[in-house]
Amino acid sequence: MATNNGDVLMLEATPEAARPWASAANAEVIDALPYIDDDYGNPLIKSEVDRLVEEEMRRSSKKPADFLKDLPPLPKFDFKNCPVLGKEYERVRAGKPPVRIDFESRYKLEMPPANKRNDDAAWKQYLQKNQRSLQQKLIELENLELMSKLGPELWRQNNHRLEVFLTRMQRLAQEQNEEIEKVNRERKYHQQTTSYELNALSQEWRQLCVKNMEIQSACAMLETQIDSFKKEAAERGWNLEEKLENVEPLQMQ
């Protein structure tokens, strides 16, 4: 059955080949008509449906806790044998306190040891080392000044980028929600328009079931009568098979 423009109704169309999350050979197909199935409001039917759903969930291979099982496994991290954390593990096992970071020594001028105070080469070496340290501190001060001067503007620009990104994500989420709502409206429309045909077919099926039961009952009565006639004929000594062979078949008018 198709519409006037040739579109096939959703419930009657052949399902398209979708790309499942996991292409399992025993993937379960779940079908439902939530927009036209109103029998769930009946308490008796509701209890029976709940029982069937619970039974199906017990037999189902798709358990709620197994949804992530279809995804690739996470990489294994061996934190226990990590060389970076090895010393910390040893310190914790030994019950030692964490090593205190000495910030004061970074800002102190180093001097040659006492036994090299009269060595010009040692003084030149430590002088160069202190000059490099001083140059590093000057660079750090310049970076702090730049951060103090330009940092607020950079934060504002970063916040603006985050706001633009948030707006874009919200727009995409809204578009997806609109697509979901569109699909739900189409499903509702197709289910409601197809419900008339389904109801007619259900009514026809029930009538055929009643007719079949009536035919089956009539056939059972005829079989009982035939058995009764055969029994009566046997008691009277009649050979029904011989008599039936001599009867000419009825001609169709």
Curated annotation (Swiss-Prot):
<protein>
    <recommendedName>
        <fullName>Pre-mRNA-splicing factor SPF27 homolog</fullName>
    </recommendedName>
</protein>
<dbReference type="GO" id="GO:0005634">
    <property type="term" value="C:nucleus"/>
</dbReference>
<keyword id="KW-0175">Coiled coil</keyword>
<dbReference type="InterPro" id="IPR008409">
    <property type="entry name" value="SPF27"/>
</dbReference>
<keyword id="KW-0539">Nucleus</keyword>
<comment type="subunit">
    <text>Component of the multiprotein assembly MOS4-associated complex (MAC) at least composed of MOS4, CDC5 and PRL1. Interacts with CYCL1-1 and CDC5. Associated with the spliceosome. Interacts with ENY2.</text>
</comment>
<keyword id="KW-0508">mRNA splicing</keyword>
<keyword id="KW-0391">Immunity</keyword>
<keyword id="KW-0399">Innate immunity</keyword>
<keyword id="KW-0507">mRNA processing</keyword>
<comment type="function">
    <text>Component of the MAC complex that probably regulates defense responses through transcriptional control and thereby is essential for plant innate immunity. Involved in mRNA splicing.</text>
</comment>
<dbReference type="GO" id="GO:0005730">
    <property type="term" value="C:nucleolus"/>
</dbReference>
<dbReference type="GO" id="GO:0006397">
    <property type="term" value="P:mRNA processing"/>
</dbReference>
<dbReference type="GO" id="GO:0045087">
    <property type="term" value="P:innate immune response"/>
</dbReference>
<dbReference type="GO" id="GO:0005681">
    <property type="term" value="C:spliceosomal complex"/>
</dbReference>
<comment type="similarity">
    <text>Belongs to the SPF27 family.</text>
</comment>
<dbReference type="GO" id="GO:0008380">
    <property type="term" value="P:RNA splicing"/>
</dbReference>
<feature type="coiled-coil region">
    <location>
        <begin position="124"/>
        <end position="235"/>
    </location>
</feature>
<dbReference type="GO" id="GO:0042742">
    <property type="term" value="P:defense response to bacterium"/>
</dbReference>
<keyword id="KW-0611">Plant defense</keyword>
<dbReference type="GO" id="GO:0050832">
    <property type="term" value="P:defense response to fungus"/>
</dbReference>
<dbReference type="GO" id="GO:0005829">
    <property type="term" value="C:cytosol"/>
</dbReference>
<keyword id="KW-0747">Spliceosome</keyword>
<dbReference type="Pfam" id="PF05700">
    <property type="entry name" value="BCAS2"/>
</dbReference>
